[in-house]
A protein has these predicted regions:
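Amide-donor transfer/coupling interface in amidating biosynthetic enzymes
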Residues: 3-144
Length: 144
């Protein structure tokens, strides 16, 4: 899915750092970008599921040429499970409408989907990732 839709300049189909399928819950940082989906989450550090074996981003140009929307919170394995340049987990198009990511935020939008959820937030009905889907819905509704 994801691998077919991203420009070849950033994704090479390289195996993850471990050279095996990875399924884990890792932390990511949402960075400022043009991403419509992640706009209300900028500055947050959230847990998210990863599940891939070929998810390594390789970038031939300098970092400032890309709209990096999300990065793994750690540079090294296992915190950066695929070994992507600059620990990149997601990039977006210049207009922010297209978001290419390896983590599976759709698997972490409910608190019970998290292996650890903050003690002080036990009453949450949904996890913060739901905002990404709300942002996308609202953008579509307002830009028909």
């Amino acid at each position: 899915g994801f691998q077919d839709g991203i420009d070849a300049f950033a994704y090479t189909g390289n195996c993850d750092y471990s050279h095996k399928f990875e399924s884990n819950f890792v932390n990511v940082n949402i960075t400022f970008s043009n991403s419509i989906m992640l706009s209300s989450l900028v500055g947050l550090r959230l847990g998210v599921w990863i599940a891939h074996g070929e998810g390594k981003f390789n970038f031939p140009y300098y970092k400032d040429k890309y709209n990096i929307a999300m990065s793994y919170s750690f540079d090294d394995y296992p915190g950066n499970p695929n070994g992507s340049d600059w620990s990149v987990a997601a990039i977006c198009s210049n207009d922010g409408r297209h978001l290419a990511m390896m983590p599976h935020l759709e698997r972490a939008f409910l608190p019970w989907q998290w292996p650890y959820y903050p003690e002080g937030r036990k009453d949450d009905e949904v996890a913060p990732w739901i905002e990404a889907f709300v942002n996308a819905f609202n953008w579509i509704k307002n830009n028909r």
